Amino acid sequence: MYQPISTEFPVYHRTSSFSSLMPCLTDTWGDLPLKVDDSEDMVIYGLLSDALTTGWTPFNLTSTEIKAEPREEIEPATSPVPSVAPPAETTTAQAVVPKGRHYRGVRQRPWGKFAAEIRDPAKNGARVWLGTYETAEEAALAYDKAAYRMRGSKALLNFPHRIGLNEPEPVRLTVKRRSPEPASSSISPASENSLPKRRRKAVAAKQAELEVQSRSNVMQVGCQMEQFPVGEQLLVS
């Protein structure tokens, strides 16, 4: 059966324990607004009084330190900025001189021309010079023709597709040799002074010998002319 709950609270009256409890509470929490004439305050007082009778006091509470949690600073979310790639440097700024194609049997001379050579198996692999050409392609073609004549279809060629085209032979570069200047028999006095002492003596002796020979030749011609009588004709057969 339903029993009505009594809403009447026990009435506590002020006793001597109130005066002993109040200093204990006020030392911990300060002045409490408990009024003797207020029924609700007396209810609170009664609860505190019962707690004191069981041996509880406010001083038994252990103060626990509350450790402040570290505050994490949250950075505002920012949209990633797209990285802009630096402009590509022009190839002309860093242009590297490309090396020419290397052909089989071709070597470049220090002065820029190209020489063609081939190893002759009949001469124990000795190098045979084929000539000097203006371009590397011409030198490579000259090597191909010589290699095909030596080894036939087994030859390793630079331009195998051109070997059967019957192209003319590449033009070789001819080196013009300077002809030696004829040594002059007469030497100027200035040049004689620049020659060493022994050299000057040899030159003087040579000149004297030439002069003696020329004089002897003149004398021989004069003697031969005197042998012919005056007025007679010389018949040449």
Curated annotation (Swiss-Prot):
Q: Give expression by tissue.
A: Weakly expressed in roots.
Which terms in the GO cellular component ontology are assigned? nucleus
Where does it primarily localize?
A: nucleus
- What does the similarity note say? Belongs to the ethylene-response factor family. Class 1 subfamily.
Q: What keywords were assigned to this record?
A: Activator, DNA-binding, Ethylene signaling pathway, Nucleus, Plant defense, Transcription, Transcription regulation
Q: Which residues bind DNA?
A: 102-160
Please state what the protein is called.
Ethylene-responsive transcription factor 2
Q: Where is the composition biased (Low complexity)?
A: 181-194
What's its job? Transcription factor that binds to the GCC-box pathogenesis-related promoter element. Involved in the regulation of gene expression by stress factors and by components of stress signal transduction pathways. Probably acts as a transcriptional activator.
- Offer one Pfam family short name for this entry: AP2
Domain free text: The AP2/ERF domain binds specifically to the 5'-GCCGCC-3' motif. The affinity of this binding is higher if the seventh amino-acid of this domain is basic.
Molecular function as annotated in GO: DNA binding; DNA-binding transcription factor activity
Gene Ontology biological-process entries: defense response; ethylene-activated signaling pathway
Give the residue ranges for region: Disordered.
175-202
Lineage: superkingdom: Eukaryota
